């Protein structure tokens, strides 16, 4: 079956790719080029913190053994906040708990760093979280107005909808330029006037991967984003802030970690338990 699919894919490769690009690909890329603002950041020495969370679980006779962590880490490796919880119950809301812990870590970090970087998209926070969590997040962000959301990928299709874009915005910017800089600021009032998201796609040096930068609120100008790029440039690894890489590495709960948790509780010897999949 797989071989047949692969052979068919080879035959239809160009046809499939043409669907992704769509009939107005060149027109959209031209628009993306005109949206691009050339800017080469200058390193600025500031304290930057990165925040990320992780959760994992394994089922056990109708219940789940789970663990959730969230950390805030400075670019030099100093851990500012280390939050963690675990338990054994049924249907735990792990994503919501991880989000709450991220918000708590953010609230503790805004006074300890000049710039606080949150891993992921503000869109996903507002789309998938309870209203109470969204309100808590807004309060954390507006406490010092120094919180920035950074993501390596993006599925948003906002900037080229009127041109019949099929792929996400980031696809067209990737094809438009390899130069350092950023796209024109896009403001999205989808979640209401108190939750407007202002965003740009940015490349901090030539040929580096694009990242998406999101801020809460409206009225930002190009200089506001340039200042952010200057602040995060010093500790960039492959185009991505090192503080966020450290946060990810420090909070990640692997299946191996979960297996240790199972062993500590003696559940691996219980009837009906199953090995954590690697």
PLM feature segments, named:
Residues 1-42, 46, 78, 94-278:
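Long, contiguous domain-sized segments
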Residues 48-51:
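Short hydrophobic beta-strand that contains or immediately precedes a catalytic carboxylate
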Residues 53-91:
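Acidic, metal-ligating active-site segments
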